Amino acid sequence: MAEKSIVQEAKDIQLAMELISLGARLQMLESETQLSRGRLIKLYKELRGSPPPKGMLPFSTDWFMTWEQNIHSSMFYNAYSFLIKNGQCSGVKAVIKSYRLYLEQCAPQSDSPLLALTRAWTLVRFVDSGMLQLSSCNCCKGMFIYPRLHQPKNSFVCSLCQPPSRAVKRLKLSQNLADIIPRLLDEQVKHAV
């Protein structure tokens, strides 16, 4: 029976703690560390105060193709790709660093970001397996996540250059709200004076 290294176990615990703090699911923890499932559950409960969520990991590439999710996924993956190509880091450390960069750029509007860490990790695995790839937009030349061999060459247009109509409607609603609030505040100031 091989004896486990105490140093390696400490590194795995530290990595698991960092992943849990970023919202990793149990399956990701099991895949990226050598800790037992029981120890990971115990660690998760200790850090989060509740057991890890149950259920399967996302296994479809469809989620990454909807317009808003695609923009967020592409931002994350471009950061990840940059870190890998420039030798900054590799493996799960590259996922963590690029996810932190993503969080800095896309501050969540609610309690949780649109792109969760486990989904970002799954995206990396989808690209590595050839199910998804980065494709260049014909208009802006930005690199976006797209299914491999799905689009004819040189015909891809990203959802920033050609947003779907529901995205434009949502943008108009939010702009109207931003226009309305200052007027309401001005009226409140006039009534107070």
Swiss-Prot record:
Listed GO CC annotations: cytoplasm
Alphabetically ordered keywords of this record: Activator, Bacterial flagellum biogenesis, Cytoplasm, DNA-binding, Metal-binding, Transcription, Transcription regulation, Zinc
SUPFAM superfamilies reported for this sequence: FlhC-like
Cofactor(s) demanded: Zn(2+)
Pfam families: FlhC
Protein's cellular compartments: Cytoplasm
GO BP, one annotated term: bacterial-type flagellum organization
Principal location listed in the UniProt entry: cytoplasm
GO MF annotations, alphabetized: DNA binding; zinc ion binding
Binding site for Zn(2+): C137, C140, C158, C161
Taxonomy, superkingdom: Bacteria
Cofactor note: Binds 1 zinc ion per subunit.
Protein family membership: Belongs to the FlhC family.
Function text: Functions in complex with FlhD as a master transcriptional regulator that regulates transcription of several flagellar and non-flagellar operons by binding to their promoter region. Activates expression of class 2 flagellar genes, including fliA, which is a flagellum-specific sigma factor that turns on the class 3 genes. Also regulates genes whose products function in a variety of physiological pathways.
Quaternary structure annotation from Swiss-Prot or TrEMBL: Heterohexamer composed of two FlhC and four FlhD subunits. Each FlhC binds a FlhD dimer, forming a heterotrimer, and a hexamer assembles by dimerization of two heterotrimers.
Protein name: Flagellar transcriptional regulator FlhC
Phylogenetic placement of the source organism: Bacteria, Pseudomonadati, Pseudomonadota, Gammaproteobacteria, Enterobacterales
Underlying gene: flhC
